[in-house]
Amino acid sequence: MAKMLRVGKITNTHGIKGDLKVLPLTDYFERFEELEWVYIEGFKDKFYIENIKYKPTLVILSFEGYGDINLVEKFKDRYLLIDESQRRILPEDTYYIADIIGLDVFTVKDEYIGKVVDIIQTGSSEVYVIRMNNLKEIMIPSVKEFMPEISLEKKRITIDPIEGMIE
């Protein structure tokens, strides 16, 4: 089976006509308009998107054939998934979170630091959480000054930390 990517989390129902509140896991809410269908975590079938509405922090979705709250209750707290073929092409130096998590991190002197275990969205930029061999976690801002190279092909990130950043 193709690698599945999370694009949203169903947080609750909305009204009685089968609408679902979805917390997008993307900066580009309109992304859902590009999708004809999605998977729902734990279900094998494709769910065809019938209607999309936007709230400031949520997307309201409905699926074909699911026009009743009783049919969609079971979807609460599950992730919306797409397969890799539905991925958007991202601009240069922009990455999917799923592609960054798990990458090895080295300094510019080729010293192994650890693995990326999480990414925190701060508004202006992202902060990568790196778990070191001693299980200590450090945070490195995802800016060129501290992160001169991200290579998905090599499955590694090169950082140029300032004094005290990785201690």
Swiss-Prot record:
<dbReference type="InterPro" id="IPR036976">
    <property type="entry name" value="RimM_N_sf"/>
</dbReference>
<dbReference type="GO" id="GO:0006364">
    <property type="term" value="P:rRNA processing"/>
</dbReference>
<dbReference type="GO" id="GO:0042274">
    <property type="term" value="P:ribosomal small subunit biogenesis"/>
</dbReference>
<keyword id="KW-0698">rRNA processing</keyword>
<dbReference type="GO" id="GO:0005737">
    <property type="term" value="C:cytoplasm"/>
</dbReference>
<dbReference type="Pfam" id="PF05239">
    <property type="entry name" value="PRC"/>
</dbReference>
<dbReference type="Pfam" id="PF01782">
    <property type="entry name" value="RimM"/>
</dbReference>
<dbReference type="InterPro" id="IPR011961">
    <property type="entry name" value="RimM"/>
</dbReference>
<comment type="similarity">
    <text>Belongs to the RimM family.</text>
</comment>
<comment type="function">
    <text>An accessory protein needed during the final step in the assembly of 30S ribosomal subunit, possibly for assembly of the head region. Essential for efficient processing of 16S rRNA. May be needed both before and after RbfA during the maturation of 16S rRNA. It has affinity for free ribosomal 30S subunits but not for 70S ribosomes.</text>
</comment>
<comment type="subunit">
    <text>Binds ribosomal protein uS19.</text>
</comment>
<feature type="domain" description="PRC barrel">
    <location>
        <begin position="92"/>
        <end position="165"/>
    </location>
</feature>
<dbReference type="GO" id="GO:0005840">
    <property type="term" value="C:ribosome"/>
</dbReference>
<dbReference type="InterPro" id="IPR011033">
    <property type="entry name" value="PRC_barrel-like_sf"/>
</dbReference>
<dbReference type="InterPro" id="IPR009000">
    <property type="entry name" value="Transl_B-barrel_sf"/>
</dbReference>
<protein>
    <recommendedName>
        <fullName>Ribosome maturation factor RimM</fullName>
    </recommendedName>
</protein>
<keyword id="KW-0690">Ribosome biogenesis</keyword>
<keyword id="KW-0963">Cytoplasm</keyword>
<dbReference type="GO" id="GO:0043022">
    <property type="term" value="F:ribosome binding"/>
</dbReference>
<dbReference type="InterPro" id="IPR002676">
    <property type="entry name" value="RimM_N"/>
</dbReference>
<dbReference type="InterPro" id="IPR027275">
    <property type="entry name" value="PRC-brl_dom"/>
</dbReference>
<keyword id="KW-0143">Chaperone</keyword>
